[in-house]
Swiss-Prot record:
Activated by 3'phosphoglycerate, inhibited by orthophosphate. Allosteric regulation. GO terms for biological process: glycogen biosynthetic process; starch biosynthetic process. Keywords: Allosteric enzyme, ATP-binding, Chloroplast, Nucleotide-binding, Nucleotidyltransferase, Plastid, Starch biosynthesis, Transferase, Transit peptide. Heterotetramer. It catalyses: alpha-D-glucose 1-phosphate + ATP + H(+) = ADP-alpha-D-glucose + diphosphate. It is found in: Plastid, Chloroplast. GO terms for molecular function: ATP binding; glucose-1-phosphate adenylyltransferase activity. InterPro entries: ADP-Glc_PPase (IPR011831), ADP_Glu_pyroP_CS (IPR005836), NTP_transferase_dom (IPR005835), Nucleotide-diphossugar_trans (IPR029044), Trimer_LpxA-like_sf (IPR011004). Seeds. The lineage of its organism: Eukaryota, Viridiplantae, Streptophyta, Embryophyta, Tracheophyta. This is Glucose-1-phosphate adenylyltransferase small subunit 1, chloroplastic.
Length: 508
C-alpha cells in the first residue's frame, strides 16, 4: 500500500491573541503529536466550530482520524481547474497522437484519472480540464469515464474539457498556465464558488484537497501553494520557496540555478523531517497546485498582472511581491511530476515495487476511477510472471514476464520474454480472421510475437511486434530518433510508437 497521506494545521501559541498557522500534509514519514479538536462545549461533535489544542512548532497532527469541517462544503464552494499542459515535447512520442493527460498509466488508467479522482474523493465535483494539443482521446476518455450530473443532480457535478479557442477579443492560443485560466475567466466566474483549485494533469500522487482548502481558509490566505521537500538534483526543475514560521511564503524563485539555487536552501526540519532527511532534501519546491480565492484570482489575472502567462514564474512571485498572503501547504507523501520519458517509465514501474509500491491503486479509502470497459479477466496460459502488474483483458501464453506493467488487451505469444518493460496494450482485439488476413499480407498482429525479447522499454498502444524481435538496446544508446522505423530512445529507454510495426527478426 502507498503511504497514507494526512494533513492538518500546526498551531503555535503567541503572546498576542492571534496564532501562527503552518499548513501541512504528511505521510507516514512524518511524526508528531495529535492536535485535538473539540466542539465549543468540550464534547466531540459531527459538525462544529473547532478549537485547537496548541502544541509545539514541531508537532504534526494525526489527521487520519481528524474531521474536515468545510462550510460551505467543497462540492458547492470549490471549482476544480485541471491544466492539461503544453505540447508534451519531453514525453514525445507518447504525446504524438494524444494530449499529455491522456497518456496511459498503470495498466488500466490515464494520467488525467489521478487529479479527477483526487477531486471526487475530496468532494469536489465541478471540474474543468483545460487543453490545447491533441485533445480528441482526452475528450473521449472523460466523456466515457465521468458521466454528466456527477455527484447527483443536487450537486450538478461535471467533468468538462475546455479546449483553446480563438475569439474576436483574443485571437491567440493559450500562452501559459495563467493565460489559459484568464481566457476562460468569463466562464469560471459564473460559478458561485469561494475558491478555484488549480491542478496539473501530469502528476502522480494522492491528496485530500478538502484539507488543503481548509488550511487555506483557516490561514485567511489569498493563495495557498502545495509544496514538498526536494533534493538538490531535482530542485532546478521546480519553483523553490522560503517560508517564515507562520508558513507564509517570503521568497519564491522559479527553477533557480547556481548561486541562486544555493540561496534557496532552508532547514526542512520545519516540515517534520528528521535531521538526516532534511539534509538530503534542503529545498521546498512548489508542486504546481494552488488554491486561490475567487476574488483574488479575478484581481490578479485581470488587473494586477494582465500580461502574466504563467502561475509559477509570474503570478505567484508577483502576488508575494505586492504583499498578498501567499501560504505554503506542506506535503511529504509520494509525488511524481511525469514530464519526461524517464519519469513516466519510473513512475509506472514503481507500482510493481515490493514490499511497498511507490504509488498504490489499491487504496480503498481513496480509489482511482477510470473508464469502465467491461473487459474479461486476463488469461495466463503456462506463463511465468514475477513482480508485475497485469491489466484487464490480456491473453498471455507460455512466456516470461518480470518486473513489468502489462496494459489492457495485451496479447503476448509463446516464448516471449518481457523484462523491466511497460506495455500499454491495445484499443481493440483482432479476430482470427484479421490475423489470417495480416499473415497473408506479410504483416503481424497487434501484440508481442513468438520468442521476442523486450527489456527496459515502453511499447505504446496497438504496436505490432513480430516474431524473434529483440528490443534490448544492447549498445546502451542513450538518445536516438528513428520515427520512420517506429521507435525513439530517450535516457536509454526504447519507446515503440503507437501503431508501429516492428518486423520479425528486428534487433534494436
Amino acid at each position: 500500500m502507498s503511504s497514507i497521506v494526512t494533513s492538518g494545521v500546526i498551531n503555535v501559541p503567541r503572546s498576542s491573541s492571534s496564532s501562527k498557522n503552518l499548513s501541512f500534509s504528511s505521510s507516514s514519514q512524518l511524526s508528531g503529536n495529535k492536535i485535538l479538536t473539540v466542539s465549543g462545549n468540550g464534547a466531540p461533535r459531527g459538525r462544529c466550530t473547532l478549537k485547537h489544542v496548541f502544541l509545539t512548532p514541531k508537532a504534526v497532527s494525526d489527521s487520519q482520524n481528524s474531521q474536515t469541517c468545510l462550510d460551505p462544503d467543497a462540492s458547492r464552494s470549490v471549482l476544480g481547474i485541471i491544466l492539461g499542459g503544453g505540447a508534451g515535447t519531453r514525453l514525445y512520442p507518447l504525446t504524438k497522437k494524444r494530449a499529455k493527460p491522456a497518456v496511459p498509466l498503470g495498466a488500466n488508467y490515464r494520467l488525467i484519472d489521478i487529479p479527477v479522482s483526487n477531486c471526487l474523493n475530496s468532494n469536489i465535483s465541478k471540474i474543468y480540464v483545460l487543453t490545447q494539443f491533441n485533445s480528441a482521446s482526452l475528450n473521449r476518455h472523460l466523456s466515457r469515464a465521468y458521466a454528466s450530473n456527477l455527484g447527483g443532480y443536487k450537486n450538478e457535478g461535471f467533468v468538462e474539457v475546455l479546449a483553446a479557442q480563438q475569439s474576436p477579443e483574443n485571437p491567440n492560443w493559450f500562452q501559459g498556465t495563467a493565460d489559459a485560466v484568464r481566457q476562460y475567466l468569463w466562464l469560471f466566474e459564473e460559478h458561485n464558488v469561494l475558491e478555484y483549485l488549480i491542478l496539473a494533469g501530469d502528476h502522480l500522487y494522492r491528496m485530500d484537497y478538502e484539507k488543503f482548502i481548509q488550511a487555506h481558509r483557516e490561514s485567511d490566505a489569498d493563495i495557498t501553494v502545495a509544496a514538498l521537500p526536494m533534493d538538490e538534483k531535482r530542485a532546478t526543475a521546480f519553483g523553490l520557496m522560503k517560508i517564515d514560521e507562520e508558513g507564509r511564503i517570503i521568497e519564491f524563485a522559479e527553477k533557480p540555478k547556481g548561486e541562486q539555487l544555493k540561496a534557496m536552501k532552508v532547514d526542512t526540519t520545519i516540515l517534520g523531517l528528521d535531521d538526516e532527511r532534511a539534509k538530503e532534501m534542503p529545498f521546498i519546491a512548489s508542486m504546481g497546485i494552488y488554491v486561490i480565492s475567487k476574488n483574488v484570482m479575478l484581481d490578479l489575472l485581470r488587473d494586477k498582472f494582465p500580461g502574466a502567462n504563467d502561475f509559477g514564474s509570474e503570478v505567484i512571485p508577483g502576488a508575494t511581491s505586492i504583499g498578498m498572503r501567499v501560504q505554503a501547504y506542506l506535503y511529504d507523501g509520494y509525488w511524481e511530476d511525469i514530464g519526461t520519458i524517464e519519469a513516466f517509465y519510473n513512475a509506472n514501474l514503481g507500482i510493481t515495487k515490493k514490499p511497498v509500491p511507490d504509488f498504490s491503486f489499491y487504496d480503498r479509502s481513496s480509489p482511482i476511477y477510470t473508464q469502465p470497459r467491461y473487459l474479461p479477466p486476463s488469461k495466463m496460459l503456462d506463463a511465468d510472471i514475477t513482480d508485475s502488474v497485469i491489466g484487464e483483458g490480456c491473453v498471455i501464453k507460455n512466456c516470461k514476464i518480470f518486473h513489468s506493467v502489462v496494459g489492457l488487451r495485451s496479447c503476448i505469444s509463446e516464448g516471449a520474454i518481457i523484462e523491466d518493460t511497460l506495455l500499454m496494450g491495445a484499443d481493440y482485439y483482432e479476430t482470427e480472421a484479421d490475423k489470417r488476413f495480416l499473415a497473408a499480407k506479410g504483416s503481424v498482429p497487434i501484440g508481442i510475437g513468438k520468442n521476442s525479447h523486450i527489456k527496459r522499454a515502453i511499447v505504446d498502444k496497438n504496436a505490432r511486434i513480430g516474431e524473434n524481435v529483440k528490443i534490448i538496446n544492447s549498445d546502451n544508446v542513450q538518445e536516438a530518433a528513428r520515427e520512420t522505423e517506429g521507435y525513439f530512445i530517450k535516457s536509454g529507454i526504447v519507446t515503440i510508437i503507437k501503431d508501429a510495426l516492428i518486423p520479425s527478426g528486428t534487433v534494436l
